[in-house]
């Protein structure tokens, strides 16, 4: 019995020149996601996925490495300009934005979108070390 030969079409990567970089920086980790204007993810990277474990995940250097990895993958889509949306109280916010700028991505705007409660839920108790 002869096998049927199927011709497979190669998936062509779409070209996106303007993108949005979402940087979520918590006290423990930093997540960098680069999306198109509609919100479809092009690339993402985390400081934990970049090889940092434990308390080193929350460092500014780990956030810088994560932003560089996300920018490298986004460059394959032809991304040139990024709007940056920063969320969270972590230490990797500034270094992630600087890393995107250093990777030849033109940062057009930086917006802080950290959610602030209008006195909603009770916060966690203070740590006693």
From Swiss-Prot:
The keyword rRNA-binding applies. GO terms for biological process: translation. It comes from the Bacteria. GO terms for molecular function: rRNA binding; structural constituent of ribosome. InterPro entries: Ribosomal_uS11, Ribosomal_uS11_bac-type, Ribosomal_uS11_CS, Ribosomal_uS11_sf. Keywords: Ribonucleoprotein, Ribosomal protein, RNA-binding, rRNA-binding. Disulfide bonds: none annotated. GO terms for cellular component: ribonucleoprotein complex; ribosome. Part of the 30S ribosomal subunit. Interacts with proteins S7 and S18. Binds to IF-3. Belongs to the universal ribosomal protein uS11 family. Located on the platform of the 30S subunit, it bridges several disparate RNA helices of the 16S rRNA. Forms part of the Shine-Dalgarno cleft in the 70S ribosome. This is Small ribosomal subunit protein uS11. It comes from Francisella philomiragia subsp. philomiragia (strain ATCC 25017 / CCUG 19701 / FSC 153 / O#319-036).
